[in-house]
Curated annotation (Swiss-Prot):
This is Enoyl-CoA-hydratase. The gene is dpgB. It comes from Amycolatopsis orientalis (Nocardia orientalis). One of its GO terms (molecular function) is enoyl-CoA hydratase activity. Belongs to the enoyl-CoA hydratase/isomerase family. InterPro entries: ClpP/crotonase-like_dom_sf, Enoyl-CoA_hydratase-like. NCBIfam families: EnCoAhydt_DpgB.
Length: 217
Protein backbone atom coordinates (compact mmCIF):
# COMPACT_ATOMS: atom_id res chain seq x y z
CA UNK A 1 0.00 0.00 0.00
CA UNK A 2 1.29 3.44 -0.93
CA UNK A 3 2.07 5.27 2.30
CA UNK A 4 1.84 8.61 0.50
CA UNK A 5 -1.89 8.13 -0.07
CA UNK A 6 -2.86 7.99 3.60
CA UNK A 7 -4.39 10.72 5.77
CA UNK A 8 -5.08 10.61 9.50
CA UNK A 9 -7.82 13.05 10.39
CA UNK A 10 -8.78 14.03 13.93
CA UNK A 11 -12.44 14.99 13.98
CA UNK A 12 -11.93 16.68 17.35
CA UNK A 13 -10.09 19.49 15.56
CA UNK A 14 -12.40 22.31 14.46
CA UNK A 15 -12.79 22.73 10.72
CA UNK A 16 -10.06 25.10 9.52
CA UNK A 17 -8.23 26.13 6.35
CA UNK A 18 -5.59 23.55 7.33
CA UNK A 19 -8.25 20.82 7.17
CA UNK A 20 -9.07 21.82 3.61
CA UNK A 21 -5.40 22.01 2.65
CA UNK A 22 -4.58 18.57 4.10
CA UNK A 23 -7.38 16.84 2.24
CA UNK A 24 -6.68 18.78 -0.94
CA UNK A 25 -3.02 17.73 -0.77
CA UNK A 26 -4.08 14.09 -0.39
CA UNK A 27 -6.27 14.41 -3.48
CA UNK A 28 -3.37 16.02 -5.37
CA UNK A 29 -1.09 13.10 -4.50
CA UNK A 30 -3.75 10.58 -5.46
CA UNK A 31 -4.26 12.21 -8.85
CA UNK A 32 -0.53 12.50 -9.55
CA UNK A 33 0.48 9.03 -8.34
CA UNK A 34 0.56 6.38 -11.07
CA UNK A 35 0.92 3.38 -8.77
CA UNK A 36 -2.15 1.19 -8.29
CA UNK A 37 -3.78 1.02 -4.89
CA UNK A 38 -6.33 2.77 -2.68
CA UNK A 39 -6.44 6.11 -0.91
CA UNK A 40 -6.90 5.55 2.83
CA UNK A 41 -8.17 7.88 5.54
CA UNK A 42 -8.11 7.07 9.26
CA UNK A 43 -10.77 9.04 11.11
CA UNK A 44 -11.89 9.50 14.70
CA UNK A 45 -13.02 12.27 17.03
CA UNK A 46 -15.88 14.64 17.83
CA UNK A 47 -15.56 18.45 17.83
CA UNK A 48 -15.64 20.01 21.28
CA UNK A 49 -18.13 22.64 22.40
CA UNK A 50 -17.65 25.95 20.63
CA UNK A 51 -16.09 24.33 17.57
CA UNK A 52 -17.92 26.72 15.23
CA UNK A 53 -16.30 29.86 16.69
CA UNK A 54 -14.95 31.83 13.74
CA UNK A 55 -16.30 29.33 11.21
CA UNK A 56 -17.70 30.87 8.02
CA UNK A 57 -19.97 29.54 5.30
CA UNK A 58 -17.17 30.23 2.84
CA UNK A 59 -14.84 27.82 4.65
CA UNK A 60 -17.61 25.24 4.96
CA UNK A 61 -18.15 25.49 1.19
CA UNK A 62 -14.44 24.90 0.53
CA UNK A 63 -14.47 21.87 2.83
CA UNK A 64 -17.57 20.37 1.21
CA UNK A 65 -16.02 20.82 -2.24
CA UNK A 66 -12.78 19.08 -1.31
CA UNK A 67 -14.72 16.23 0.33
CA UNK A 68 -16.64 15.89 -2.93
CA UNK A 69 -13.33 15.82 -4.78
CA UNK A 70 -12.18 13.00 -2.49
CA UNK A 71 -15.46 11.20 -3.10
CA UNK A 72 -14.88 11.28 -6.87
CA UNK A 73 -11.18 10.35 -7.01
CA UNK A 74 -10.07 8.05 -9.81
CA UNK A 75 -9.13 5.25 -7.45
CA UNK A 76 -10.71 3.26 -4.62
CA UNK A 77 -11.06 5.12 -1.31
CA UNK A 78 -11.13 3.42 2.08
CA UNK A 79 -11.98 4.89 5.49
CA UNK A 80 -10.94 3.29 8.77
CA UNK A 81 -12.90 4.68 11.72
CA UNK A 82 -12.60 4.20 15.46
CA UNK A 83 -14.21 5.63 18.57
CA UNK A 84 -16.67 8.50 18.29
CA UNK A 85 -16.86 9.98 14.77
CA UNK A 86 -18.46 13.33 14.00
CA UNK A 87 -17.66 16.52 12.15
CA UNK A 88 -14.94 16.20 9.53
CA UNK A 89 -14.34 12.57 10.56
CA UNK A 90 -17.92 11.62 9.70
CA UNK A 91 -17.78 13.62 6.47
CA UNK A 92 -14.84 11.59 5.16
CA UNK A 93 -16.18 8.27 6.39
CA UNK A 94 -19.43 8.74 4.48
CA UNK A 95 -17.58 9.88 1.34
CA UNK A 96 -15.33 6.80 1.16
CA UNK A 97 -16.07 3.82 -1.09
CA UNK A 98 -15.39 1.25 1.63
CA UNK A 99 -15.69 1.76 5.40
CA UNK A 100 -13.98 -0.32 8.09
CA UNK A 101 -14.74 0.39 11.76
CA UNK A 102 -13.44 -0.98 15.02
CA UNK A 103 -15.82 -2.39 17.65
CA UNK A 104 -17.50 0.34 19.67
CA UNK A 105 -17.30 2.96 16.94
CA UNK A 106 -20.23 5.40 16.98
CA UNK A 107 -21.29 7.81 14.25
CA UNK A 108 -22.92 11.10 15.18
CA UNK A 109 -23.58 14.58 13.89
CA UNK A 110 -21.69 17.35 15.63
CA UNK A 111 -23.80 19.51 17.98
CA UNK A 112 -24.37 23.16 17.10
CA UNK A 113 -26.92 25.84 17.97
CA UNK A 114 -29.13 23.56 20.05
CA UNK A 115 -29.37 20.93 17.31
CA UNK A 116 -27.09 19.01 14.93
CA UNK A 117 -24.76 20.30 12.23
CA UNK A 118 -26.76 20.55 8.94
CA UNK A 119 -23.82 19.85 6.63
CA UNK A 120 -23.63 17.44 3.72
CA UNK A 121 -23.23 14.46 6.03
CA UNK A 122 -27.00 14.78 6.49
CA UNK A 123 -27.37 14.46 2.71
CA UNK A 124 -25.08 11.42 2.55
CA UNK A 125 -26.76 9.75 5.53
CA UNK A 126 -30.15 10.21 3.88
CA UNK A 127 -28.96 9.03 0.46
CA UNK A 128 -27.19 5.99 1.86
CA UNK A 129 -29.49 4.87 4.66
CA UNK A 130 -32.85 6.49 3.91
CA UNK A 131 -34.72 9.15 5.86
CA UNK A 132 -36.39 6.70 8.23
CA UNK A 133 -33.09 5.17 9.26
CA UNK A 134 -31.36 8.40 10.23
CA UNK A 135 -34.14 10.64 11.60
CA UNK A 136 -33.15 10.21 15.24
CA UNK A 137 -29.50 10.89 14.45
CA UNK A 138 -30.33 14.09 12.56
CA UNK A 139 -33.19 15.43 14.69
CA UNK A 140 -32.08 14.33 18.16
CA UNK A 141 -28.34 13.84 17.76
CA UNK A 142 -28.65 10.18 18.72
CA UNK A 143 -25.38 8.33 18.03
CA UNK A 144 -25.54 5.55 15.44
CA UNK A 145 -24.08 2.50 17.16
CA UNK A 146 -21.89 0.16 15.16
CA UNK A 147 -24.51 -2.60 14.82
CA UNK A 148 -27.06 -0.14 13.48
CA UNK A 149 -24.49 1.41 11.15
CA UNK A 150 -23.91 -2.06 9.70
CA UNK A 151 -27.64 -2.72 9.37
CA UNK A 152 -28.07 0.61 7.56
CA UNK A 153 -25.10 -0.19 5.26
CA UNK A 154 -23.28 2.92 6.41
CA UNK A 155 -20.22 0.78 7.16
CA UNK A 156 -18.97 -2.37 5.46
CA UNK A 157 -17.10 -4.26 8.15
CA UNK A 158 -16.38 -4.25 11.86
CA UNK A 159 -12.83 -5.42 12.46
CA UNK A 160 -10.76 -6.15 15.55
CA UNK A 161 -7.70 -5.94 13.30
CA UNK A 162 -8.35 -3.09 10.86
CA UNK A 163 -4.74 -3.14 9.63
CA UNK A 164 -5.17 -6.73 8.43
CA UNK A 165 -8.54 -5.94 6.85
CA UNK A 166 -7.07 -2.88 5.17
CA UNK A 167 -4.15 -4.88 3.79
CA UNK A 168 -6.57 -7.33 2.16
CA UNK A 169 -8.57 -4.53 0.57
CA UNK A 170 -5.40 -2.80 -0.60
CA UNK A 171 -4.29 -6.00 -2.32
CA UNK A 172 -7.64 -6.24 -4.12
CA UNK A 173 -7.52 -2.55 -5.04
CA UNK A 174 -4.06 -2.95 -6.57
CA UNK A 175 -5.62 -5.04 -9.34
CA UNK A 176 -8.18 -2.36 -10.24
CA UNK A 177 -7.97 0.35 -12.87
CA UNK A 178 -8.62 3.69 -11.21
CA UNK A 179 -10.49 5.25 -14.12
CA UNK A 180 -12.77 2.23 -14.40
CA UNK A 181 -13.40 2.31 -10.66
CA UNK A 182 -14.47 5.95 -10.94
CA UNK A 183 -16.87 5.08 -13.78
CA UNK A 184 -18.49 2.28 -11.75
CA UNK A 185 -18.82 4.60 -8.76
CA UNK A 186 -20.50 7.26 -10.91
CA UNK A 187 -22.96 4.67 -12.20
CA UNK A 188 -23.84 3.81 -8.60
CA UNK A 189 -24.35 7.50 -7.77
CA UNK A 190 -26.63 8.07 -10.76
CA UNK A 191 -28.58 4.80 -10.66
CA UNK A 192 -30.17 5.64 -7.34
CA UNK A 193 -32.16 8.49 -8.90
CA UNK A 194 -32.33 7.62 -12.61
CA UNK A 195 -34.90 5.65 -14.59
CA UNK A 196 -33.84 2.52 -16.46
CA UNK A 197 -34.28 4.26 -19.79
CA UNK A 198 -32.11 7.22 -18.77
CA UNK A 199 -29.47 4.97 -17.21
CA UNK A 200 -29.19 2.66 -20.21
CA UNK A 201 -27.05 5.02 -22.27
CA UNK A 202 -24.46 5.48 -19.53
CA UNK A 203 -24.25 1.75 -18.91
CA UNK A 204 -23.91 0.97 -22.62
CA UNK A 205 -21.14 3.56 -22.90
CA UNK A 206 -19.35 1.97 -19.95
CA UNK A 207 -19.82 -1.49 -21.48
CA UNK A 208 -18.43 -0.29 -24.81
CA UNK A 209 -15.40 1.18 -23.04
CA UNK A 210 -14.84 -2.08 -21.15
CA UNK A 211 -15.07 -4.16 -24.35
CA UNK A 212 -12.60 -1.89 -26.15
CA UNK A 213 -10.13 -2.10 -23.27
CA UNK A 214 -10.49 -5.88 -23.13
CA UNK A 215 -9.93 -6.19 -26.88
CA UNK A 216 -6.65 -4.27 -26.71
CA UNK A 217 -5.30 -5.94 -23.57
Amino acid sequence: MNGELVLRLDGARPLSPASVEELSALCDRAEDDREAGPVTVHVTGVPSAGWTAGLTVGLVSKWERVVRRFERLGRLTIAVASGECAGTALDLLLAADLRIVTPGTRLRLAPVGGSTWPGMSVYRLTQQAGAAGIRRAVLLGTPIEVDRALALNLVDEVSDDPAKTLAGLAEAAAALDGAETAIRRQLIFEDGSTTFEDALGAHLAAADRALRREATS
